[in-house]
């Protein structure tokens, strides 16, 4: 029989927290333990999924993309991380053959539904004093590696008006982000410079190169395209203004996805029956679930993140909220058994 899949990912970002991803995997194990202990009959088997590389070191979500059939050989052969190490090299160093990822695709006929329990990774639920978030859709995201190329000069002898200072180009672009969103985005739009590397990196040397990442998000793919176009135009204008060259490489482009209305209804009805407060909400962060939408009805359950903190060592969710999230997951699974 086709299975209902539950789970999430086990990896997190460097210096991340203990709840991101792991919550969904451990909660899945706990649900199955309860079902076995109480000998609850199932119409459809339940499988627990623990994916790898969700955080996008190489620009995608390797595990979920492999399972959903979203990988291409071209991407596998060319994906690399911000340091330049390729996915092929990283897998080979661990005795893995990247070609095998192409054979991990699940047959949609063998999958009945997918549900992912996850921390919100934001402040909305806590601020609204809600226990559960019923996710309506997952934001799209693009990731670029950008390079401004100028000229390294002596910081004492190079006049300010004759410099080709790569960092000044980066600083100008960072200042433009708010304008770009105001003119082209929505209240769901995000643009983030998360990593910067200045070269040669000496206190008394004008930076000749600035390498940085740019991550853009929105719930509309057209808005994402508008943001990307505006960013390209701004980068080009800034490069001319500061006598620089600029290059960019798109590491990934993940479309926004909508959750299954039926699975959303099941999660909402379950939450109501349990007496928990909740709200419908989008996910501003990317998740494994967005790839499973391509092959099966998919839903997500959020629980509050204390202070909205995530991707940091002090990431935390109260255990009472973890318990309630697990209860919603378990009872949604059982309700789906009878309604799919």
Per-range role (PLM):
Residues 31-45:
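Flexible, small-residue-rich helix->loop connector segments that border functional cores
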Residues 11, 53-222:
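Midchain, well-structured core segments that form catalytic/ion-binding scaffolds
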Residues 192-201, 213-215, 219-220, 245-264, ...:
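A short beta-alpha structural unit
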Residues 73-75, 217-221, 251-253, 308-319:
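Short beta-alpha connecting loops at secondary-structure transitions
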Residues 7-8, 278-328:
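Zn-dependent metallopeptidase/amidohydrolase metal-coordination segment
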Residues 227-236:
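Short amphipathic alpha-helices in soluble, non-transmembrane regions
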Residues 41-45, 101-105, 157, 179-193, ...:
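Flexible, glycine/charged-enriched surface loops at secondary-structure junctions
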Residues 1-17, 35:
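Acidic/His- and Gly-rich active-site-bordering loop/insert found
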């Amino acid at each position: 029989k086709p299975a209902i899949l539950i789970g999430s990912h086990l990896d997190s970002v460097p210096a991340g927290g203990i709840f991101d991803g792991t919550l969904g995997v451990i909660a899945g194990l706990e649900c199955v333990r309860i079902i076995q202990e109480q000998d609850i009959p199932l119409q459809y088997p339940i499988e627990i999924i623990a994916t790898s590389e969700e955080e996008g070191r190489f620009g995608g979500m390797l595990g979920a993309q492999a399972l959903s059939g979203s990988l291409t050989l071209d991407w596998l052969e060319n994906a690399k991380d911000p340091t330049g190490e390729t996915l092929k090299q990283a897998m080979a160093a661990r005795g893995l053959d990247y070609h095998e990822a192409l054979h991990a695709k699940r047959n949609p006929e063998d999958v009945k539904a997918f549900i992912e329990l996850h921390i919100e990774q934001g402040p909305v639920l806590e601020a609204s004093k809600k226990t559960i978030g019923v996710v309506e859709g997952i934001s799209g995201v693009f990731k670029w590696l950008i390079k401004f190329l100028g000229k390294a000069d002596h910081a004492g002898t190079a006049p300010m008006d004759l410099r080709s200072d790569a960092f000044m180009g980066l600083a100008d672009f960072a200042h433009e982000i708010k304008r770009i969103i105001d003119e082209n985005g929505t209240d769901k739009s995000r643009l983030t410079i998360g990593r910067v590397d200045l070269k040669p990196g000496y206190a008394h040397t004008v930076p000749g190169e600035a390498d940085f990442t740019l991550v853009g998000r929105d719930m509309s793919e057209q808005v994402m395209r508008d943001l990307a176009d505006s960013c390209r135009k701004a980068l080009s204008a800034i490069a001319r203004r500061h006598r620089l060259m600029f290059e960019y490489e798109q590491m990934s482009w993940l479309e926004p996805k909508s959750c299954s209305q039926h699975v959303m209804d099941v999660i909402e009805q379950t939450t109501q029956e349990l007496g928990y407060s909740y709200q419908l909400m989008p996910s501003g962060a990317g998740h494994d679930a967005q790839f499973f939408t391509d092959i099966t009805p998919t839903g997500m359950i959020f629980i509050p993140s204390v202070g909205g903190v995530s991707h940091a060592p002090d990431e935390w969710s109260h255990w009472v909220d973890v318990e309630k999230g697990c209860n919603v997951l378990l009872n949604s699974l059982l309700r789906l058994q009878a309604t799919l």
